[in-house]
């Protein structure tokens, strides 16, 4: 067994948690010796039973199963040396949380005050108890906008407990959208842009005006929507209409960046409406994954 394989007792691993499956793969060390062979272990997936799709219980059970050694894996005898607990880095499908972009003057606020503003927003918007959510907020350079995310505390605690029960320690837990934004914004050609991320159960949009975060929008994708180009295109246009209400932007002034792995979209229709359209990931190819698989395998790259 390679020391970098998923089942190695001390190896850190990446986890992608979708709505219908959990994917697990080896984590690449930051510094790898030049002569060290690449790990032969690839990612593997653990599907949730259909009755547990979109449920925390299904995610917890699949996470525990994903962290267990494969039944047919053969672990050779190794010298008895102290080994550290496996660390897991988890990225969640955005279905499991909520996001928001808040505008204001945050320049003089401390991190705790910024978090409390974000918490108050989610409490007011969704009517939840502030103690039941875990909030993360990031203020954009310049201090005039904040990107905030919230996760149910029960989900965070459950992920930590499921990892611990399988002999692993949760080192990181994050939602996918902020990671996708960080990796795709440099590919957008204009200061005014709407970036659309369509994957699995959600179509999300982030509108940027003059280089500043302006608005966030999210809509649900239901069964069959991903393979309906007209539907996906309509949802993208509706997202712009809602976001643009808070700005002075028009379609013709705004570029569009579309990330739609496995999502069918009518790019020609979007190109006729927006100043330009940039495809940030393969689109116009509907890949309905067999066996109820979800977006989980794609999440692994954002856990690295």
Describe these PLM feature segments.
Residues 1-304:
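Hydrophobic/aromatic-enriched cytosolic interaction surfaces used to assemble or bind macromolecules
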């Amino acid at each position: 067994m390679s020391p970098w394989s998923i089942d190695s007792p001390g190896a850190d691993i990446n986890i992608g948690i979708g709505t219908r499956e959990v994917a697990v793969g080896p984590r690449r060390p930051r510094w790898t010796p030049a002569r060290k062979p690449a790990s032969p272990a690839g990612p593997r997936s653990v599907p949730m039973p259909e009755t547990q799709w979109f449920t925390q219980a299904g995610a917890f059970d699949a996470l525990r199963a994903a962290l267990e050694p494969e039944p047919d894996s053969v672990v050779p005898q190794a010298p008895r040396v102290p080994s550290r607990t496996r660390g897991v880095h988890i990225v969640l499908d955005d279905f499991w949380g909520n996001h928001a972009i808040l505008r204001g003057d945050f320049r003089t606020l401390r991190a705790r005050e910024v978090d409390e503003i974000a918490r108050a927003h989610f409490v007011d918007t969704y009517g939840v108890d502030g103690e039941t959510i875990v909030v993360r907020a990031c203020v954009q350079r310049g201090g005039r906008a904040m990107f905030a995310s919230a996760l149910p505390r029960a989900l965070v605690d459950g992920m930590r407990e499921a990892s611990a029960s399988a002999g692993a320690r949760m080192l990181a837990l994050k939602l996918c959208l902020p990671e996708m934004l960080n990796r795709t914004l440099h590919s957008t050609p204009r200061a005014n842009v709407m970036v659309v991320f369509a994957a699995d159960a959600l179509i999300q949009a982030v509108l940027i005006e003059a280089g500043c975060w302006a608005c966030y929008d999210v809509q649900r994708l239901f069964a069959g929507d991903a393979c309906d180009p007209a539907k996906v295109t309509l949802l993208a246009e509706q997202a712009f209409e809602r976001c643009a209400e808070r700005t002075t932007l028009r379609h013709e002034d705004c570029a569009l960046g579309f990330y739609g792995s496995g999502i069918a979209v009518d790019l020609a229709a979007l190109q006729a409406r927006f100043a330009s359209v940039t495809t940030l990931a393969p689109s116009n190819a509907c890949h309905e994954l067999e066996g109820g698989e979800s977006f989980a395998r794609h999440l692994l790259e954002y856990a690295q």
